[in-house]
Regions:
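Short acidic/histidine-centered micro-motifs embedded in hydrophobic/aromatic stretches
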Residues: 96-100, 115
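Glycine-rich phosphate-binding loop at the start of an alpha helix
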Residues: 56, 60, 77
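Substrate/cofactor-recognition hotspot
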Residues: 99, 104-110
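Short, structured motif recognition centered on aromatic/hydrophobic residues
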Residues: 59-67, 96-97
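Acidic, glycine/proline-rich low-complexity segments that act as flexible tails and inter-domain linkers
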Residues: 1-56, 85, 109-127
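Mid-chain, well-packed structural core segment of small domains
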Residues: 69-94
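Active-site-proximal catalytic alpha-helix in oxidoreductases
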Residues: 64-72, 104-106
Length: 127
């Protein structure tokens, strides 16, 4: 295994997801197939999410937008944490979610805003 890629994967995962309570999908994947989980993590986190063409903040806001339209609550939850962890503001995350009304409709926006509120509560940032 490429040690540099392994370290980059760990560093990126920690930067993005260190505030998640209850673990990440990776923990569940390992219970199913440890080797496949490692390969998936190294590809997604070590290679794709570590690219520097766009900033981590831009990448996470894209993820929040896409996952909102797809109505993937658990993933929105993880990536809202990640977006905030890499410098996105509450206003930026909210704006990205609201913008998705054009593409996914109001129900997915309402659901993602509910998830966003939960994340802020978990972080002690809901007021």
């Amino acid at each position: 295994m490429d040690e540099a890629l392994k370290e980059k994967t760990k560093k990126t995962a920690k930067m993005l997801f260190h505030t998640l309570k209850g673990g990440t999908g990776f923990e569940d994947w390992k219970k199913i197939d440890k080797e496949l989980a490692r390969e998936l993590s190294m590809f997604f986190t070590g290679k794709l999410y570590s690219r520097e063409v766009i900033s981590q903040k831009q990448r996470e806001l894209c993820a929040v937008a896409s996952l909102t339209v797809l109505n993937r609550e658990r993933e929105v939850h993880a990536h809202v944490h990640a977006a905030l962890n890499v410098g996105a503001t509450r206003q930026e995350v909210a704006e990205v979610i609201f913008q998705q009304v054009t593409y996914g409709g109001m129900p997915v926006v309402v659901e993602s805003l509910r998830v966003f509120k939960e994340v802020l509560e978990e972080r002690g940032e809901w007021q």
